[in-house]
Amino acid sequence: MSVEEQFKTSAEQVKKLKSSPSDTELLELYSLYKQATIGDVNTDRPGMLYLKEKAKWDAWNGRKGLGKEQAQELYVKKVKELVEKNGLA
């Protein structure tokens, strides 16, 4: 299975986890997913009143320069860890 196919499968598996990942894990997944699908952050940083959006933006921006395939590989690895930890519903 190609990295792209593994990535798509992992994106579906995340929706089926028995328990929700921690906020830190969710930010990691979000940043890797955005980097893998869009690339480097392409929007302005949200203002200080938008705490959740700012945290997501910061996490994504922290992946700046990471290639698509590498981001996909890291995403697949993280999802595998979460599946082992939480199981699938």
UniProtKB/Swiss-Prot annotation:
Residues 3-88 form the ACB domain. GO terms for biological process: fatty acid metabolic process. GO terms for molecular function: fatty-acyl-CoA binding. Keywords: Lipid-binding, Transport. PROSITE patterns: ACB_2. The keyword Magnesium does not apply. InterPro entries: Acyl-CoA-binding_protein (IPR000582), Acyl-CoA-binding_sf (IPR035984), FERM/acyl-CoA-bd_prot_sf (IPR014352). Pfam families: ACBP. An acyl-CoA binds at K15, Y30, S31, L32, Y33, K34, K52, K56, Y75. Disulfide bonds: none annotated. Binds medium- and long-chain acyl-CoA esters with very high affinity and may function as an intracellular carrier of acyl-CoA esters. Belongs to the ACBP family. This is Putative acyl-CoA-binding protein. It comes from Hypsibius exemplaris (Freshwater tardigrade).
